[in-house]
Amino acid sequence: MIQSDEDNLDSSETTASTSYSGTSSVSSRLQLRTSLFFENLNGAHGNPDAETEMATVAYETTSRGQGFAVYINNERFSQIMGASTSSSSSSNSSSITQFHDTQDNNIPSNTTVRPTSLRRDNEDTVPLRNVTPSQNAAVRPERAVNSPSSQRLSCALTISTSVLMGEDVEGSPIEQEHSRVVSSLYSSLANRGNDESKNGTPPRPTSIEPNETTEHSFFSYHYDDTLEPDVEEAVRLTKNKTSNVNFISSTGSKGEGETEDEVIDQYEPVNESKFIPHKLKIPEKAGSIKSSTSDDSHSPGAPGTSARKIKIPQSPSLIGNILIPSHNSDSSNESSPKDHIGHNNEEKFSSKSTRKPSTSLEEEGPPIGLPSIPVLRSVSGPSKWTKTPLRLESGNSTKSDPFSRYEGHKTPSPLTKMNKKKNKTLPEHGQPLVLAPIKSQSSESDTGQNSIIEKPARSIRRKQQEKTDNRKEDRHDAENIDLEARMPIQHIDTASIHSFDSGQNGFRDVYSIENIIVILLCCSIVPPLFFIIGCSSRRKLVSDYRLMRLLMNKEHRAALLQGFIWDVDLRWFRMFCLILGAAETVIVMAGIAIGFGVGITRE
């Protein structure tokens, strides 16, 4: 439909189609005032598919009425502008800048106009763009039609019905509608400039970038100078970002008229400088950090990084406050008065609790190759802990502070009785140190049920001493020692292994008589089975493991494991099978011979 109408127009004229909905009376008035030519889409052609041939955006039918196509002559656009400014009372005192600041209440501010240039093919049908307009249908980009007779660029815009009808605007809807149509068209064409007809057709963009939405927005034609970035401010910000860089040296001193930024530019950063190992003075050990930092502070040519000294905490660690140093430590000068008090208490405790015979003098020091572990002080805690502190039970110590012997409950469990019996047999130097459990309010009611868990805390040297004592006793009492009892068990102690009952009277305890009878009946039906079982001890046709599973009871078969040498004598059964097999063969042979003899005699 549009192609047929456009062939009647001049080739030099470019058209812009505008789709909207309205009544026929308003469209006739707009035609007289703005020199617009309206054509009813449904009346132009009888076929209902006329809208599919439009090059503009196809809109769905709304409640406002039927759609119309509006053709605007670009050459007469200036005349329309002049007529509108002279006739409309709202646009008498406004200049061209009025159209830059024009705002329509029916057009949302986020809508943009993209002046796109598309090409109309010579085909009859053009693919549609189905757009569903809202109640306030905003200005939308359309496909500009490139006529076959004209290669000039056409302007295609879609104007909403509310813009042309002016239903939501106060005052005369026709007069205000005219000014809004002209202002919207002018603002959409402002980006293209007024020299389009002079300079000819502008180059058609190959692709539409997303940045065009901001550049060609409907109300963003006034660019402020504040939006442009300040170059000097950007340079200053980039310099501030690199303010944390350590600078080694400057090429020149700061003058009176020079700024601080100019002096910073003369510095050379560490990253770009050549790496010199001896200037950094990296200490080899952690203990030499303090000495190296002190040397760097006094050296005249030290780098700028040495100004920041590594802060080492002078106060002792938290765990050092609760640890008592051992008597071998050399921290008498640096320790606090509390450490001296704890050290004296530890010496008193060690002197009282380490009274041993001359044979155990080696236990005074720590074991060779192992560090000494200091003893913990009493740590402050809840009130229930202070009532029953952790006690350490020693062999000969009767009174010690803060440690004392733990005597246990009044009703000891069987486990404690056994431990007491074992402790009596131990030598005097082998008395174990037992840690008592901490009492609590929740566990006081269950003390009778729970047994006391005693864990001996023996040192490595004590264990070594016990081994040496045992060796000495073994040398003196070698005749009374049962060597067989000390040997580790190298066999599985089950009933099926130690089953010497087969050689004794307990035959029924090992073998199953029912299974033996069933096997013999099967072998009597098939006589070769007797020889297979009897002679398979060497040829391994029937192994001992399979034969035991056939003959033994269920209790013995449950513990049988393949791959072991079982202490079960099965030769009697194999010999019995050979005897029965030979007897059966003799009986069969005799029967056959008797049969032949009877037959011969009858003949």
Swiss-Prot record:
The chain crosses the membrane at residues 516-536, 578-598. It is a multi-pass membrane protein. Residues 537-577 are cytoplasmic. GO terms for cellular component: cellular bud tip; incipient cellular bud site; plasma membrane. It is found in: Cell membrane; Bud tip. It comes from Saccharomyces cerevisiae (strain ATCC 204508 / S288c) (Baker's yeast). Residues 1-515, 599-603 are extracellular. Glycans are attached at N92, N110, N211, N240, N271, N333, N396, N423. N- and O-glycosylated. Its main location: membrane. Residues 336-350, 463-479 have a biased composition (Basic and acidic residues). Residues 1-10 have a biased composition (Acidic residues). GO terms for biological process: cellular bud site selection; pseudohyphal growth. The lineage of its organism: Eukaryota, Fungi, Dikarya, Ascomycota, Saccharomycotina. Interacts with RAX1 RAX2 at the proximal or distal pole in unbudded cells. This is Bud site selection protein 8. The keyword Endoplasmic reticulum does not apply. The gene is BUD8. It comes from the Eukaryota. Involved in positioning the distal bud pole signal. Belongs to the BUD8/9 family.
